């Protein structure tokens, strides 16, 4: 039996790009140069996280078991003005057809629609500058270097626009939903009346040999569907996107219908669909409900009628209740899916240079905005993404770095805003993980 598997069509993940390497504070100490200038190199760029569309993947199941991804940081700068090494980017494969959204805002970040297409979803932080960049005529030996910029952190929602590889078609109550529930872990509602399946139910079929494909139980058809009767048009649009059709015909002798007429009616509706002749799709004819007494006689007549009308195809016998014929049918479906995919891949070959990398760009406000919150008497906290990034990139191990940060905060108006909120000398001020005493 195929292994049941839940079909995952959307999931939530977290991505953390790598921090840039820290800039170095260093000085030249060479013979005959006792007063050598600054020689601290820059840190390397942190690794970005990049999605790559891969048409060999069908689901987002890999992201169900691992939801957090972190790229490596860049190397720190070195002495003698040597730059730190940039970190390698982290590439994550996703199925073609994956759309990426910001989990909290719902903003669409990108849509991966071509095999090999890349999307940068979290950009690595730039390396901090070493003290070779901060020498001036006034301060020829600066003890100032920047820490590496933090890598972008994002919470993402991945959504896969599922195109079922195999579509189950046939009149209502021929056993489509039952078959889907047997070969996958999908749990469609099943009942013996028309149009039980109001929308496609999706599942993944995993075969013992490692092959897999997605399968959809589509709404049952009736005569006139191609003209919009019942759920016909919606149904046919779903069929249009499948690779293989499993055409199920009931062998229940008590349903009062002729098996070949049912088969011919469905074929006619598929062929009459105005947007495409769906009857030309690869098809497997399935004689369902073979466990019902009298089904063998009805099957024999069905085969005679097919032959009389020039249909030279094998009919696969199936009982979803007893699982008779399920393994053989699923193996044949996987064979046809592979054949169709090979044909599509050959027809869709494109020069490699046509696939471009897209980068999601976060647009920071031009003005560095911040807010001051009074936590308690003599305690204040300053909020602001860019301000917190500035503090994170400041090397606070050296007095020159601390003084440079103080000057920048004053220039931005932080001191004035703290005074306006009632701050006095000695009050504690917090910016992210950094704290200091306010001085008028």
Swiss-Prot record:
Q: Where does Mg(2+) bind?
A: 177, 197
Superkingdom field: Bacteria
Gene that produces this protein: obg
- Molecular function via GO: GTP binding; GTPase activity; magnesium ion binding
Q: Would you name any one GO CC term?
A: cytoplasm
Q: What class of enzyme is it?
A: hydrolase
Give the organism, scientific name: Lactobacillus delbrueckii subsp. bulgaricus (strain ATCC BAA-365 / Lb-18)
Q: Does the keyword GTP-binding apply?
A: yes
According to its UniProt entry, one GO biological process term is:
ribosome biogenesis
Name of the protein described by the UniProt record: GTPase Obg
Obg domain location: 5-163
Residue ranges of domain OCT in the record: 362-440
Function of the protein? An essential GTPase which binds GTP, GDP and possibly (p)ppGpp with moderate affinity, with high nucleotide exchange rates and a fairly low GTP hydrolysis rate. Plays a role in control of the cell cycle, stress response, ribosome biogenesis and in those bacteria that undergo differentiation, in morphogenesis control.
The protein's Enzyme Commission number: 3.6.5.-
Q: Which residues bind GTP?
A: 170-177, 195-199, 217-220, 288-291, 319-321
The answer to keyword Cell wall biogenesis/degradation applying to this record is no
The record ties this protein, via NCBIfam families, to:
Obg_CgtA, Obg_CgtA_exten, PRK12296.1, PRK12297.1, PRK12299.1
């Amino acid at each position: 039996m195929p292994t049941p598997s839940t079909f995952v069509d959307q999931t939530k993940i977290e991505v953390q790009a790598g921090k840039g390497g820290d800039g170095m504070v260093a000085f030249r100490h060479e013979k005959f140069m006792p007063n050598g200038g600054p020689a601290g190199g820059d840190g390397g760029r942190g690794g970005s996280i990049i999605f790559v569309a891969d048409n060999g993947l069908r689901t987002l199941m890999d992201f169900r078991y691992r939801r957090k991804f972190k790229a490596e940081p860049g190397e720190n700068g070195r002495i003698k003005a040597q730059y730190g090494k940039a970190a390698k980017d982290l590439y994550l494969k996703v199925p073609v057809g994956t759309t990426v959204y910001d989990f909290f805002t719902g903003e669409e970040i990108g849509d991966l629609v071509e095999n090999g297409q890349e999307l940068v979803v979290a950009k690595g932080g730039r390396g901090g500058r070493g003290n070779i960049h901060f020498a001036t005529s006034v301060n020829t030996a600066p003890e100032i270097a920047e820490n590496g910029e933090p890598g972008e952190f994002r919470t993402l929602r991945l959504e896969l626009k599922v195109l079922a590889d195999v579509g189950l078609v046939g009149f209502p109550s021929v056993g489509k939903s039952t078959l889907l529930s047997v070969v996958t872990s999908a749990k469609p509602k099943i009942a013996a009346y028309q149009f039980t399946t109001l929308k496609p139910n999706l599942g993944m079929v995993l075969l013992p040999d490692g092959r897999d494909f997605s399968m959809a139980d589509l709404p049952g058809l009736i005569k006139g569907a191609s003209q919009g009767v019942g759920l016909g048009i919606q149904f046919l649009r779903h069929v249009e996107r499948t690779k293989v059709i499993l055409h199920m015909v009931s062998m229940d002798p008590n349903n009062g219908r002729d098996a070949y007429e049912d088969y011919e009616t469905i074929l006619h509706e598929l062929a009459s669909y105005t947007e495409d002749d769906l009857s030309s799709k690869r098809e497997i004819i399935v004689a369902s409900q073979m466990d019902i007494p009298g089904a063998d006689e009805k099957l024999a007549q069905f085969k005679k009628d097919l032959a009389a009308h020039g249909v030279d195809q094998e009919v696969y016998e199936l009982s979803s209740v007893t699982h008779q014929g399920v393994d053989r049918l699923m193996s044949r479906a996987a064979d046809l899916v592979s054949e169709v995919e090979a044909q599509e891949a050959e027809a869709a070959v494109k020069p490699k240079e046509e696939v471009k990398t897209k980068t999601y760009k976060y647009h920071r406000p031009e003005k560095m905005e911040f807010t001051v919150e009074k936590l308690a008497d003599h305690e204040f906290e300053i909020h602001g993404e860019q301000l917190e990034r500035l503090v994170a990139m400041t090397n606070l191990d050296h007095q020159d770095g601390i003084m440079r940060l103080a000057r920048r905060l004053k220039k931005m108006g932080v001191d004035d805003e703290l005074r306006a909120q009632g701050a006095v000398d000695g009050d504690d001020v917090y910016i992210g993980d950094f704290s200091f005493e306010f001085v008028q």
